Amino acid sequence: MAGQFRSYVWDPLLILSQIVLMQTVYYGSLGLWLALVDALVRSSPSLDQMFDAEILGFSTPPGRLSMMSFVLNALTCALGLLYFIRRGKQCLDFTVTVHFFHLLGCWLYSSRFPSALTWWLVQAVCIALMAVIGEYLCMRTELKEIPLSSAPKSNV
């Protein structure tokens, strides 16, 4: 159906490159947020903050700051969905994919499956925030008016 508006073409290379790009955005921005938080509280940065499920918690200040970094990262990644994915229908797919690979990364890093309830809660909140805000931003872009002519308007 060549005449269909916004027809979707299956392009595995594009999808793989978008997955890699979103993983890069996810870990790059998470690293920046964690570095900023560590600089503010004069803490030493560690990969444990990113990949150890036991770090996240309400009882310790580093745990709360790490949770805040994850939530801020979800907002930043929603902008990544807007600029790199650009389709509201695909935001949830890419969000879940990014977090699934993060789950695998945490599992490999700590050699055990994440079992901390706070880790799962933070990931669920981040998935919801990233998907909903990313979809909202993408839909706003998709619903913009399409200019039909480049001629200047005349007031008649």
From Swiss-Prot:
Subunit structure, as described in the record: Interacts with ARFRP1.
InterPro entries, sorted: Integral_membrane_SYS1, Integral_membrane_SYS1-rel
Mode of membrane association: Multi-pass membrane protein
Annotated TM spans: 13-33, 65-85, 91-111, 113-133
Superkingdom per UniProt: Eukaryota
Encoding gene per record: Sys1
Localization per record: Golgi apparatus membrane
The UniProt record lists the keyword Electron transport: no
Protein purpose: Involved in protein trafficking. May serve as a receptor for ARFRP1.
Biological process according to GO: protein transport
Record-given protein name: Protein SYS1 homolog
Keywords annotated in UniProt: Golgi apparatus, Membrane, Protein transport, Transmembrane, Transmembrane helix, Transport
Manganese among keywords: no
GO cellular component: Golgi membrane
Family: Belongs to the SYS1 family.
